[in-house]
């Protein structure tokens, strides 16, 4: 349960390379 603090901004989650730290996608509330 890391929460959204380790998540990248949703607009960066559309491409993995834009998000080298933390997590993306549905885990962070992105889709």
Swiss-Prot record:
This is Delta-actitoxin-Dar1b. Binds specifically to voltage-gated sodium channels (Nav), thereby delaying their inactivation during signal transduction. Pfam families: ATX_III. It comes from the Eukaryota. GO terms for molecular function: sodium channel inhibitor activity; toxin activity. It is found in: Secreted; Nematocyst. InterPro entries: Neurotoxin_3_Actiniidae, Neurotoxin_3_Anemonia. Keywords: Disulfide bond, Ion channel impairing toxin, Nematocyst, Neurotoxin, Secreted, Toxin, Voltage-gated sodium channel impairing toxin. Belongs to the sea anemone short toxin (type III) family. Its main location: secreted. Da I is found as a major form, whereas Da II is found as a minor form. GO terms for cellular component: extracellular region; nematocyst. Contains 4 disulfide bonds. It comes from Dofleinia armata (Armed anemone).
